[in-house]
Amino acid sequence: WKPKSIKDSGNAGWHRDSQYWPFWGNDGLFTAWIALSNVSTSSGPVRFIPGSNHWKDIDGLDFFNKDLISQEKILKDNYGNIKIVDALLSAGQVSIHSSHTYHSSGANLDETPRVGMVVHFCTDRAIRQRVTGSNSTYLDQLKDASISPFIFGGDP
């Protein structure tokens, strides 16, 4: 859900999903972004940097930082001229990216909301890691099929 934005209020900063998932190893995690409405260049599409899933982590990038210009400067300082691709989708289409792909989205300038949903999924290559602190309960929730269902047979 991304309603019409005022300036940068609807921005999602450049980030990798993996930076928010300390309870998983570095492989086999993906995000599916499902468009429930048409997504145009003016509705704040998800934007990707192809190949960035092979980059090292970059300090200073954060989903919650709405200043995309300063974050794009950080990206260019680290990797030079970068290519950014918008995920322009019709309702019902899906965009899938690795948890290590840098992505963001800008403001929705349309009169109607941009509507979508996200599904995070993992392959058999994803390895759970025990963490401490506030994230420590997530692994227990992953064993609960009512919260984190498995779509294939076998033991989680």
Tell where the protein language model's regions lie, with residue ranges:
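Conserved double-stranded beta-helix
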Residues: W1-R47
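Extracellular structured ligand-interaction cores
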Residues: D27-T31, S43, I84-D86, R114-V118
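Non-heme Fe(II)/2-oxoglutarate
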Residues: L61, V94-I96, H100-P156
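Short histidine-centered beta-strand/loop micro-motifs
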Residues: A12-R16, P22-G25, A87-L88, G106-D110, ...
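Short capping/connector residues at structural and topological boundaries
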Residues: I6, Q19, N26, A35, ...
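Short, surface-exposed loop/helix-turn segments at secondary-structure junctions
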Residues: A12-R16, K66-N81, E111-P113, V131-L139
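Double-stranded beta-helix
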Residues: V39-G106
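Short edge-strand/loop segments of extracellular domains
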Residues: P3, I49-K56, R114, H120-A126
